[in-house]
Amino acid sequence: MDMLTWAALSADEQKTALQRSPLIGDSGLEQSVRAIVDAVASRGDAAIKEFNQKFDGARLANISSANSDNLRLSEHEIEAASARVSPELKAAIAQAMANIDVFHSAQQFRPIDIETQAGVRCELRSEPIEKVGLYIPGGSAPLISTVLMLALPATIAGCEQRVLVSPPPINDAIVYAANVCGITEIYQVGGAQAIAALAFGTETIPSVDKIFGPGNRYVTEAKRLVSQDGRCTVSIDMPAGPSEVLVIADSDANAQFIAADLLSQAEHGPDSQVILVTDSLPLAQAVNQALKSQLAALPRQEIAATALKGSRTILVKDMQEAALVSNRYGPEHLIIQTRFPREVLNNIRAAGSVFLGAYTPESVGDYASGTNHVLPTYGYSRAVSSLSLADFSRRFTVQELSAKGLLGLGQAVMTLASNELLDAHKNAVAVRLASLKG
């Protein structure tokens, strides 16, 4: 990776050093996705089946003829798919589920009920989102962990209807993971058409209140479009971008560990970005050597090598400056491999998820430590939080005033309303005060 010295860079050069690769897209993307969304909104299941055949035709041929035209998996199909999953994988899923359950169950909302002044009672309450849609991408590698990260919190939160969609044929492990997480509605549909179905509903697929899950640029664009479409009322989880990691390391860090962590993100895709920030030139050089040897053994070495071309090492004077660089970048994943990692953590202000110490690879958070791996990317961690139980609920406030409360607060409200030239607001208080004063 290219090596830069932070203190030697101008302000503009520092900004360039922390730039990400441009998001891949084309001028026709919105038009293409909008056509799919509109077709599903107007023609429902018929459009879904046409797009399934068009985009997933080869894979549809692998589905049993008895169900090749059915969008929803039957209870029998769910049981059969689950039976084909190996005991070893089931055990791994169970261990990951247990940790995710513990961490997310601890996030249960605690209501606030307080008197702000005499006779003025204010509350903050929370209720689960009634209907949620979970999108799980297809492809050669089943994203089992993503099912756990979405389905389990939705179940813990108490969402009444939990719908999962994934391109056909859905991998057995995906079906099993969904089932053990309490998902009983599983539909064979992927891509932009799946997002549109969740937003508008079809004859078979119910509309939902919020859509979660990663996907390719068509899925990402569809999520953006439906969240802004006046024909439906649906929200989405968070903006999506390429995967990324920033590693803060000092001279005590293990170069082999760091190289492995960098490559574990680089192999996600050619637009992934990895950054090493260190105050040790010998360590930086050792990491570069370790990258070369480990890269040669990777099946996805071409993808990882392309990602490394857009990545870099940044040399800093100390760990305080390292934290400053990290905060300006706002990484999706932040790994801190230093002698005193928690001291560095105290200076961190922006990160999707943080991994402390030599024995905490980013992979554990991806799969089974208990934290959620759905994280803000592309610098959004400076303002957007990682996925949590709160994302599957909505909060609302309650206020209740007694007569004494209104007498004590009314004049302030009327004064503010008058200054904002909102006389009806003022009058709503005035008529009540008049009735109290007889």
From Swiss-Prot:
UniProt-annotated binding residues for NAD(+): 135, 193, 216
Catalytic residues identified in the record: 332 (proton acceptor), 333 (proton acceptor)
Reactions listed under catalytic activity: L-histidinol + 2 NAD(+) + H2O = L-histidine + 2 NADH + 3 H(+)
One of the GO biological process terms: L-histidine biosynthetic process
Protein's recorded name: Histidinol dehydrogenase
GO molecular-function terms, A-Z: histidinol dehydrogenase activity; NAD binding; zinc ion binding
EC number: 1.1.1.23
UniProt xrefs under PROSITE patterns: HISOL_DEHYDROGENASE (PS00611)
Keyword Ribonucleoprotein found: no
Organism: Shewanella oneidensis (strain ATCC 700550 / JCM 31522 / CIP 106686 / LMG 19005 / NCIMB 14063 / MR-1)
Gene Ontology CC: cytoplasm; cytosol
